[in-house]
Amino acid sequence: MKTIYKYLLNTLPRPLLIRLSYVFRLVAPIAFKGSNVECPVCERKFRKFLSYGSDIAHRENVLCPYDLTLERHRLLWLYLKQSNFFNAKKINLLHIAPEQCFYPIFKKQPNLNYTTADLESPLADLHFDLHQIPLEENVFDVIFCNHVLEHVEDDHQCMTELYRVMKKGGWGIFQVPINYESETTYEDSTITDPKEREKHFWQKDHLRLYGKDYPSKLKEAGFKIEIFNPRTDLKNLNYQKMRLNPDELVYIAIKQ
């Protein structure tokens, strides 16, 4: 079973994987029955999670077999639950590259006017290139755009586009892979071979690997940055049970 999951996750195109995830849900509760780990998003317990990631960034016991959440999804969910997100007044939400684990939840929230966007995802309402968003200025109260900026040619241009379509007083979360051992972002446009990109940037289709300067890059695009640190902002958090990355922070990008 583990071999089958790994093969599917690493070889199938994302749109097809999204469709097949509904089948995974039928198998997971039986194949991974247990209570060693817990996913706060689907609120299910399992014997273990699945492994995930490239050979360079491989992690064991991180992928929920039911809703396919990873460490970053579970951390974002914990932030949203402790904030006023689900109880706030009507929110215009733009969700770029919508994650399968969040899509059905956000879709049914009565306080969310929910718009999804992507290059090709079958989940998306809109399809566009993030470098030039075909929407007016000051439209959205909240924008989620997670694990996208490491894939784009000009991340600063994309950040300024996110800033442009966000309302004044709005906020967004744009998670990216971060090497917390590096002070600065590493990118080299001469590295084009997929294997070399995986070696340098942790994945074959990544164009850069962000460092601890990532929030400064968001500031350069105009955002004010607030930091959610689960170690200090959440009490009695069981990192091991939920299989979270103890170093990961959530940067909230605010348009003043």
For the regions a language model picked out, list residue spans one by one.
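Conserved N-terminal segment of class I S-adenosyl-L-methionine
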Residues: K2-P134, N229-Q256
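Hydrophobic beta-strand segment of the Class I
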Residues: I96, I143-F144
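Alpha-helical membrane segments in multi-pass integral membrane proteins
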Residues: V142-I143, L162
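Local beta-strand N-terminus motif with an aromatic residue
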Residues: K90, F140-D141
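Short catalytic micro-motifs in class I SAM-dependent methyltransferases
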Residues: H147-H151
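S-adenosyl-L-methionine-dependent methyltransferase catalytic module, highlighting the catalytic core
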Residues: T3-K6, F24-V37, E153-Y163, K167, ...
